[in-house]
Amino acid sequence: MTNIRKTHPLAKIINNSFIDWPAPSNISAWWNFGSLLGICLILQILTGLFLAMHYTSDTATAFSSVTHICRDVNYGWIIRYMHANGASMFFICLFLHVGRGLYYGSYMYPETWNIGIILLFAVMATAFMGYVLPWGQMSFWGATVITNLLSAIPYIGTSLVEWIWGGFSVDKATLTRFFAFHFILPFIVLALAAVHLLFLHETGSNNPSGIPSDSDKIPFHPYYTIKDILGALFLILVLMMLVLFSPDLLGDPDNYIPANPLNTPPHIKPEWYFLFAYAILRSIPNKLGGVLALVFSILVLAIVPLLHTSKQRGMMFRPLSQCLFWLLVADLLTLTWIGGQPVEHPFITIGQLASILYFAILLILMPAISIIENNLLKW
């Protein structure tokens, strides 16, 4: 009798995606992050659902409701901190996943790559709106500053900002709609992730060598399921160490002060995972220019496939490109550090140089170095 997982219409889809799916035999631990992101997303949806049962999206009670969750709800504190630090783990996995794609040339699957970029924007939007919900000082002022950036759009900017706010400032209407969007977006992300996976399974996985691996495939289960479980255990270990030992390590102390429109915090800054983009935004003195640079800092990923000039797919056998890649990583870490610093000398100059270098590496240096490497192959 044929196995039910190969005949049942629904089980067949799962079987072909996660059990009998032919995977390259040489994919490394850098290929673990897709499954880890799936785990993060499910974890965020589940913890978020339980938080939403006790949270109130009203300016008068939002801050108190979060306090109530931590103090009065059974295990509310662990759910709240798993959700907050789960977002950090989500972004760590996201950055490593995108970095893997850049390093090994996974962007040569344009459909999968472009859906990935849309996913990145959707997750960033979700995280931003989630940060507003506790209604602390940094929530309020972060929302004010970031939504205000849209006023840089010529002609319709001011009307657009007031339309998003639902009034003339960030207030009750803003909080309510942000809660609604924060609730629905993860389910949209889930649907997009399914499409992302669908496109990936049309082409099959890339591998470290960048050479087609059709002649050497192994079944996903048990080889990669066990590998993914190991990665998941590491993820949960790091997350629970954060949650149980230093839950506020990655947060901002200002967010334990209730939102006060009359008192501006000395340094308004977003969560750590947005600091690199925030540093690029602040590096440009012009408001509209800064907003465009902010959007383009992520959107630049969409033109990376068009600028691929190398004869080889990945960077495994391209030492010059590897040097540039790790320079890009160092540059992003520098931008993250600068984003959390006050706007004063020497941080302004460092931020501007790091921002120029970020775009230069992706748009100019990478394609140029690839051409040089192509010529070196002839020698």
UniProtKB/Swiss-Prot annotation:
Q: Which cofactor does it need?
A: heme b
Q: Where in the cell is it found?
A: Mitochondrion inner membrane
Classify the main location: mitochondrion
Give the residues the record marks as binding heme b b562: H83, H182
Keyword Electron transport (UniProt) = yes
GO biological process: one example: mitochondrial electron transport, ubiquinol to cytochrome c
Q: Which InterPro entries match?
A: Cyt_b/b6_C, Cyt_b/b6_C_sf, Cyt_b/b6_N, Cytb/b6-like_sf, Cytochrome_b, Cytochrome_b_C_euk/bac, Cytochrome_b_N_euk/bac, Di-haem_cyt_TM
Record's function text: Component of the ubiquinol-cytochrome c reductase complex (complex III or cytochrome b-c1 complex) that is part of the mitochondrial respiratory chain. The b-c1 complex mediates electron transfer from ubiquinol to cytochrome c. Contributes to the generation of a proton gradient across the mitochondrial membrane that is then used for ATP synthesis.
Also noted in the record is: Heme 1 (or BL or b562) is low-potential and absorbs at about 562 nm, and heme 2 (or BH or b566) is high-potential and absorbs at about 566 nm.
Protein name per the record: Cytochrome b
Q: Which organism is it from?
A: Martes zibellina (Sable)
